[in-house]
């Protein structure tokens, strides 16, 4: 078992030595522009890159992050983004509660959870695309 491992390591080492040019410089091109392993920013493409750039600016275009909780009073309600004029909302009410209270939230004034009285307000939201 150990001899197989040593033979495998020896083969890899000889391949690495053959990959060098006549002057001893490596012929293999690195993936990153600066050399070495690319960073997440250099490697990300598409939607992942768009989300990373938005996060760097402090934005959340696809609602990936949890909403910021407020006190939930009538003067400072929890803001619920929606692309329509109504949205269904789930309230846990208490920290150790295992039941979710679901209710419809409509555009306009802040509305209360029927169970605990926490206030929620629907705010318009535009999609990123």
Curated annotation (Swiss-Prot):
It comes from Bos taurus (Bovine). PROSITE patterns: COX5B_1, COX5B_2. GO terms for cellular component: mitochondrial inner membrane; respiratory chain complex IV. The modification N6-acetyllysine is found at residues 68, 86, 121. Residues 1-31 form a transit peptide. Component of the cytochrome c oxidase (complex IV, CIV), a multisubunit enzyme composed of 14 subunits. The complex is composed of a catalytic core of 3 subunits MT-CO1, MT-CO2 and MT-CO3, encoded in the mitochondrial DNA, and 11 supernumerary subunits COX4I1 (or COX4I2), COX5A, COX5B, COX6A2 (or COX6A1), COX6B1 (or COX6B2), COX6C, COX7A1 (or COX7A2), COX7B, COX7C, COX8B and NDUFA4, which are encoded in the nuclear genome. The keyword Transport does not apply. Component of the cytochrome c oxidase, the last enzyme in the mitochondrial electron transport chain which drives oxidative phosphorylation. The respiratory chain contains 3 multisubunit complexes succinate dehydrogenase (complex II, CII), ubiquinol-cytochrome c oxidoreductase (cytochrome b-c1 complex, complex III, CIII) and cytochrome c oxidase (complex IV, CIV), that cooperate to transfer electrons derived from NADH and succinate to molecular oxygen, creating an electrochemical gradient over the inner membrane that drives transmembrane transport and the ATP synthase. This is Cytochrome c oxidase subunit 5B, mitochondrial. Its main location: mitochondrion. It is found in: Mitochondrion inner membrane. Zn(2+) binds at residues 91, 93, 113, 116.
């Amino acid at each position: 078992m150990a001899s197989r491992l040593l033979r495998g390591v020896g083969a890899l080492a000889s391949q690495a030595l053959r990959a060098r040019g006549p002057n001893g410089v490596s012929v293999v091109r690195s993936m990153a522009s600066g050399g070495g392993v690319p960073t997440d920013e250099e490697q990300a493409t598409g939607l992942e890159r768009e989300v990373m750039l938005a996060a760097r600016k402090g934005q959340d275009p696809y609602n990936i992050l949890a909403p910021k909780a407020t006190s939930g009073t009538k003067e400072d309600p929890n803001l619920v983004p929606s692309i329509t004029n109504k949205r269904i909302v789930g309230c846990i009410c208490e920290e150790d509660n295992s039941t979710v209270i679901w209710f419809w939230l409509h555009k306009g004034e802040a509305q209360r959870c029927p169970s605990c009285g926490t206030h929620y307000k629907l705010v318009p939201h535009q999609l990123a695309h």
